């Protein structure tokens, strides 16, 4: 699985939906970056959250399970190699749907955070969408509904203080290209997503949620 992500590192770095967006702006804002603030960016991918936080004055450490992503630390979200309360804030954007054990990952993020955890991920949950996601990218585990995110954060000992739901515009062809989806599967993915796709685009339901200790 990590080999697959490593091979896509450049695609994640240049991806329009990863490198910009209201969700990225909000994750950065809710981390409250500034001089003296330390942040761990979990599953950093193309490093977009880390870059924005550093530009805002925060000290950022990046972690990712895929060596090819070039993170400061190669580690899965479920096993973060840091002491308790090592960072003011822990951020994780557009990655949790890949985690083998999302509950363990959120618990680990809460453990190494002093103040808060900020998570952003897709909430497109249906049988058809899950089949489409796995067909497009076998590293996809599953998306989680808003109520599930509430439970995950609360079980990790976090108090939910902010949340915002939004829809992000997703261009289908680059999305399929980024995962190197085989030609035989692309048509089926489009079929499964059905009339959600309009003129080659679809709106992707997304949640940004913040939990404090």
Please provide the spans of the model-predicted regions.
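Short alpha-helix
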Residues: 142-157
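Class I SAM-dependent methyltransferase SAM/SAH-binding core
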Residues: 40-79
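A short His-aromatic
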Residues: 97-98
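A conserved beta-strand element that flanks and buttresses the S-adenosyl-L-methionine
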Residues: 91
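Conserved class I S-adenosyl-L-methionine
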Residues: 1-34, 48-52, 116-141, 173-177
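Conserved Class I S-adenosyl-L-methionine
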Residues: 46-48, 147, 159-213
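A short glycine-rich, Lys/Arg-flanked "PGG" loop and its adjoining helix->strand segment in the class I
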Residues: 103-117
């Amino acid at each position: 699985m990590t080999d697959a992500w490593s091979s896509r590192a450049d695609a994640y770095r240049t991806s329009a939906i990863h490198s910009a967006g209201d969700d990225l702006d909000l994750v950065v804002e809710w981390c409250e970056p500034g001089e003296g603030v330390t942040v761990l960016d979990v599953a950093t991918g193309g490093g977009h959250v880390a870059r924005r936080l550093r530009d805002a004055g925060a000290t950022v450490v990046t972690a990712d399970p895929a060596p090819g992503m070039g993170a400061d630390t190669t580690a899965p979200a479920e096993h973060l190699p840091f002491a308790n309360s090592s960072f003011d804030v822990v951020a994780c954007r557009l990655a949790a749907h890949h985690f083998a054990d999302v509950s363990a990952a959120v618990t680990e993020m809460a453990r190494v955070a002093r103040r808060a955890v900020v998570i952003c991920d897709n909430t497109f949950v249906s049988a058809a969408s899950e089949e489409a996601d796995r067909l497009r990218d076998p590293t996809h585990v599953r998306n989680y509904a808003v109520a599930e995110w509430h439970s995950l954060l609360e079980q990790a000992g976090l108090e939910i203080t902010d949340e915002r739901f939004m829809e992000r515009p997703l261009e289908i062809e680059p999305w399929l290209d980024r995962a190197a989806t085989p030609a035989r599967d692309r048509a089926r993915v489009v079929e499964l997503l059905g009339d959600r796709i309009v003129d080659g685009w679809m709106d992707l339901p997304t949640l940004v949620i913040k939990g404090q200790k």
